[in-house]
């Protein structure tokens, strides 16, 4: 990677424009939204549909695309890695993960690291990740000076962690009064839990896929969910 260090954010941004670095891409090169959708649709087809017998049957499909969090305030982190300690100022939603990240990058123990949680602004879950913390730590460790990393809106949009693409199918049986008697649904989307908490990778579905699925619906006699995580 490339880091441009200057005495102002503007100077750093202009210097990076002059460098105009080009990156070939990693192991996801060639991956497109179309290919991802094809995989999810295939998984959904594997689940199949449940036959619903009722006076009226609604059979619908919904799809939401990958969505950027678009934090209202720039992604930023200030880090100062010294010879025997580290101090971090960061708007984070996950202090323990930030601590683990700092320990991994610096090699320091927990008692050698101090984290100041600043005001978050509009985080929307994006600041649960620590990639921007890693950047500040690596540069500060190299320079042995305090460094503030600030992402431009363009960088934030290109390199964010996106809310997942999801495809859902519903079959709802209604009586002659229009009240639901049977609710069947199939959902296919990436398993965020396995990504965010690798130790939970053994779980072949993400309960967060359908939060309402954990609740009972006393007004609907029959309801059934099928989830396929990718």
Task: Please identify what each model-predicted range represents.
Residues 1-230:
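Structural alpha/beta core scaffold segments of enzyme domains
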